[in-house]
């Protein structure tokens, strides 16, 4: 993973907080890992509250470019999108009550959730089946189209508009899933694309806590889930 920052004028001072080191857990093991930095020096190597490894680096004097490269090898277990039981110190039950301006449910979101509550009463569905139906419904209602929304667009607004991108799909999904009683969270990263190593933007998807499975991933924009 390589990131390059270029400046027209050298910054007087800049600090980067890097979270570029994978975690060792039940689904993956680090075989080797390193971070190369040009234009900065590492000032601190520590861990955050969630046990993610963090590097703080400070710019050197009179630089116009910073290049940060992280690389290594991992042994990964294929879990089909199921991350498993929580490793965070925050009780997962609390996440169903967490909200923000992006995921605050309005009239449109509440109408969507009411529709599903009525559907779920009629059918004997597992939680996984319910959430897959929700994901498909959102993608059908909100067509993927760039340029119609921004990083400031809320779930309610994008659902009303009928267009959006991955972050909009996730915000709608989170708002709806939480109203349905499911703890759920926003995940950002990269979508693996064939025949390309350079990506212009990051990707977003959701994870929902399902009893007896743990955290389960739902990529609403691409219709990918267990």
Q: Positions of the model-derived regions?
A:
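A broad, low-specificity signal for short, low-complexity segments enriched in glycine/proline
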Residues: 27-35, 145-147, 164-170, 178, ...
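Secondary-structure boundary elements
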Residues: 74-76, 83, 93-164, 172
């Amino acid at each position: 993973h390589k990131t390059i920052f270029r400046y027209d004028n050298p910054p007087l001072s800049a600090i980067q907080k890097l979270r570029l080191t994978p975690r060792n857990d039940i689904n993956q093991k680090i075989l080797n890992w390193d971070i190369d930095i040009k234009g900065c020096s590492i000032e601190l190597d520590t861990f955050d509250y969630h046990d993610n490894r963090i590097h703080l680096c400070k710019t050197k004097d009179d630089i116009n470019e910073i290049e940060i490269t992280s690389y290594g090898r991992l042994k990964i277990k294929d879990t089909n999108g199921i991350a498993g039981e929580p490793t965070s110190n925050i009780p997962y039950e609390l996440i169903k009550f967490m909200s923000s301006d992006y995921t605050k449910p309005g009239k449109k979101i509440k109408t969507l959730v009411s529709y599903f509550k009525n559907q779920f009463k009629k059918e004997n569905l597992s939680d996984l089946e319910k959430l897959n139906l929700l994901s498909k419904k959102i993608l059908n209602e909100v067509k993927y189209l760039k340029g119609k929304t921004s990083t400031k667009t809320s779930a309610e607004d994008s659902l009303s508009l009928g267009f959006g991108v991955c972050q909009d799909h996730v915000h709608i999904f989170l708002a709806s899933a939480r109203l349905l009683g499911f703890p759920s969270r926003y995940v950002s990263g990269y979508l693996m694309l064939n025949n390309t190593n350079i990506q212009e933007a990051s990707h977003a998807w959701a994870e929902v806590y399902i009893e007896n499975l743990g955290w389960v991933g739902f990529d609403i924009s691409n219709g990918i889930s267990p």
